[in-house]
Amino acid sequence: GHAEKSILNKMNIKHRRNWHINSWVDLCKIMMDEIIVVNGALNFGLKSVARAMYNHDMISTCWNNEMNGLQAMETMIDCEEIARKQNKRFQDLKHVKDVMKYNEVDCKVMWEIISYFREKI
């Protein structure tokens, strides 16, 4: 989506890097363009599709909390400030670990969805 591209651009500026991704794949767009629907999915969003597929035993991974992408980003911003003020390592903060797990599940769910459709379609 758009957010990932914007975040990458901001990180390149902030860290004076030139990380470049030639090809972005938007799973939501693919599902909408190909009209792939899953019984129980209320929309084409990752969480809705993944939860529906999980409920139908089509994938084996799902989130165990109610965090969303915006909350994850806000948490990381807050943790950066907390780590600085408390002179702690950013990656040692509990909330950072929670966001890392949330993002890990995001990636694993996308991989399982893609794998499922590659195998079944």
Q: Model-flagged regions — what are they?
A:
Residues 1-121:
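DEDD superfamily 3′-5′ metal-dependent exonuclease/proofreading module
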